[in-house]
Amino acid sequence: MIQQESRLKVADNSGAREILTIKVLGGSKRRYAGIGDIIVATVKQATPGGVVKKGDVVKAVVVRTKSRVRRNDGSYISFDENAAVLIKDDKSPQGTRIFGPVARELRDNDYMKIISLAPEVL
């Protein structure tokens, strides 16, 4: 589960390497974000020459979480790290490449561009 002050790895080539969660979108009392949820975050580490800089406030969608997620068939999926992909206001990714696997649950939330860019969908 991702909440305020959670640090996530960035799984794209937008220039950010690590982000810190400011807010979970989707209601005033919403505390946790899971796979496919949108968060507002600030960039804590960035690569030189990237599109985003350290200190920028960005929107991101969570693509991997350490906490396990239950699927409809009864199976569970979890990852080794918490990761997100930076998105624009129209839900399209800021970067042109996605690193690492992403969860199949993104398909339910209409993130087809992220699914198509990902090297592996679990």
UniProtKB/Swiss-Prot annotation:
Keyword Transmembrane helix appears in the UniProt entry: no
GO biological process entries: translation
A GO cellular component entry from the record: cytosolic large ribosomal subunit
Organism domain of life: Bacteria
Keywords of this entry: Ribonucleoprotein, Ribosomal protein, RNA-binding, rRNA-binding
Residues spanning the signal sequence: none
Gene Ontology molecular functions: large ribosomal subunit rRNA binding; structural constituent of ribosome
InterPro entries: Ribosomal_uL14 (IPR000218), Ribosomal_uL14_bac-type (IPR005745), Ribosomal_uL14_CS (IPR019972), Ribosomal_uL14_sf (IPR036853)
Any Pfam family hit: Ribosomal_L14
Assembly mode: Part of the 50S ribosomal subunit. Forms a cluster with proteins L3 and L19. In the 70S ribosome, L14 and L19 interact and together make contacts with the 16S rRNA in bridges B5 and B8.
Function: Binds to 23S rRNA. Forms part of two intersubunit bridges in the 70S ribosome.
Database matches in HAMAP family: Ribosomal_uL14
PANTHER family (alphabetical): 50S/60S RIBOSOMAL PROTEIN L14/L23, LARGE RIBOSOMAL SUBUNIT PROTEIN UL14M
Family: Belongs to the universal ribosomal protein uL14 family.
Name of protein: Large ribosomal subunit protein uL14
Organism this protein belongs to: Levilactobacillus brevis (strain ATCC 367 / BCRC 12310 / CIP 105137 / JCM 1170 / LMG 11437 / NCIMB 947 / NCTC 947) (Lactobacillus brevis)
